[in-house]
Amino acid sequence: MALSLERKGEIIKTYQIHENDTGSPEVQIAILTERINYLNEHLKINSKDHHSRRGLLKMVGQRRSLLDYLKKKDFERYRSIVTRLGLRR
């Protein structure tokens, strides 16, 4: 199941840089993290769902790319988003 519009809106409001910001790396990383967490819970119950596992790995790779970009571009924003989301880096 995809993120509900309400939940996605909450995430965007929490992590946006300015009022109309929906595509900054911080927002994208936060949305991907929410989707990754949902899929992790799904896969704990449905361990044989290999199609979803592949999608999860793709999302993790996308988030990793966005984090690497942000780390290169602005290290302070990178540290901030990692801390706020509770990622292990």
UniProtKB/Swiss-Prot annotation:
One of the primary rRNA binding proteins, it binds directly to 16S rRNA where it helps nucleate assembly of the platform of the 30S subunit by binding and bridging several RNA helices of the 16S rRNA. Forms an intersubunit bridge (bridge B4) with the 23S rRNA of the 50S subunit in the ribosome. Part of the 30S ribosomal subunit. Forms a bridge to the 50S subunit in the 70S ribosome, contacting the 23S rRNA. The lineage of its organism: Bacteria, Bacillati, Bacillota, Clostridia, Eubacteriales. GO terms for biological process: translation. GO terms for molecular function: rRNA binding; structural constituent of ribosome. Belongs to the universal ribosomal protein uS15 family. InterPro entries: Ribosomal_uS15, Ribosomal_uS15_bac-type, uS15_NS1_RNA-bd_sf. The keyword Cell membrane does not apply. One of its GO terms (cellular component) is cytosolic small ribosomal subunit. It comes from the Bacteria. This is Small ribosomal subunit protein uS15. The gene is rpsO. Keywords: Ribonucleoprotein, Ribosomal protein, RNA-binding, rRNA-binding. The keyword Oxidoreductase does not apply.
